């Protein structure tokens, strides 16, 4: 699993088990290759982790922290990251995860971190997945309300699900394959 604070939530509350997790609060495409996170008790870069291990499946979910950049730059960085992961783990099935929506209130309060931009980015991520032969899963179908926003019953801060729902998220991923 590679990702940001939402992936940290999956790790801390989702009962991932023995899976390696390269995630941190604030992780982005722009610091992905220079960051180190604790994996297996040792702080490593993503390049070290991918170089030392062989994975069957890699879940990749980044993008929300990048929304302050131009969509063109985000898509460029995203595509390059996927290509590098594919080069280093050619046998792995790569699953690109849509970015979780924010609540309607959170979306209305921001010109940058809103569901319109998240949907635009998710569409671009889905395109990258098609172009590069990756799978794409959109967890918003699990947590959105009728308005197409993260349902407030699942969130306190407007952008993350409550800890007790990360296990549901992981189960949903497992059901999707």
Question: What does each model-identified segment do?
Answer:
Residues 102-177:
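Catalytic His-Asp segment of secreted/periplasmic serine-dependent ester chemistry enzymes
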Residues 89-93:
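A short helix->loop->beta-strand "cap" motif at the edges of active sites that frequently abuts
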Residues 50, 85-87, 129:
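N-terminal cationic-hydrophobic initiation segments that often serve targeting/anchoring roles
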Residues 61, 97-98:
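Alpha/beta-hydrolase-fold catalytic nucleophile elbow
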Residues 78-82, 122:
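Generic structural signal for well-ordered alpha-helices
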Residues 22-25, 97, 137-142:
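Conserved beta-strand termini and adjacent loop/short-helix elements that scaffold enzyme active sites
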Residues 32-36, 64-73, 85, 109-115, ...:
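Second-shell loop/turn segments in exported
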Residues 1-77:
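Conserved SGNH/GDSL esterase-like catalytic core that processes O-acyl groups on lipids
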């Amino acid at each position: 699993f590679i990702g940001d604070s939402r992936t940290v939530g999956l790790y801390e509350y989702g009962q991932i088990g023995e899976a390696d997790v390269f995630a941190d609060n604030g992780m982005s495409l722009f610091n992905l290759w220079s960051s180190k996170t604790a994996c297996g008790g040792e702080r490593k870069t993503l390049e070290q982790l991918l170089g030392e291990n062989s994975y069957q499946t890699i879940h990749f979910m980044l993008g929300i922290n990048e929304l302050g950049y131009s969509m063109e730059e985000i898509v460029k960085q995203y595509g390059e990251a996927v290509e590098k992961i594919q080069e280093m783990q050619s046998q792995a099935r790569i699953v690109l995860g849509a970015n979780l929506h924010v609540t309607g209130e959170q979306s209305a309060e921001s010109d940058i971190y809103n569901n319109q931009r998240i949907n635009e980015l998710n569409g671009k991520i889905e395109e990258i997945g098609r172009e590069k032969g990756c799978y794409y899963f959109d967890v918003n179908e699990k947590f959105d309300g009728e308005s197409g926003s993260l349902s407030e019953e699942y969130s306190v801060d407007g952008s993350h699900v409550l800890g007790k729902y990360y296990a549901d998220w992981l189960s949903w991923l497992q059901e999707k394959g």
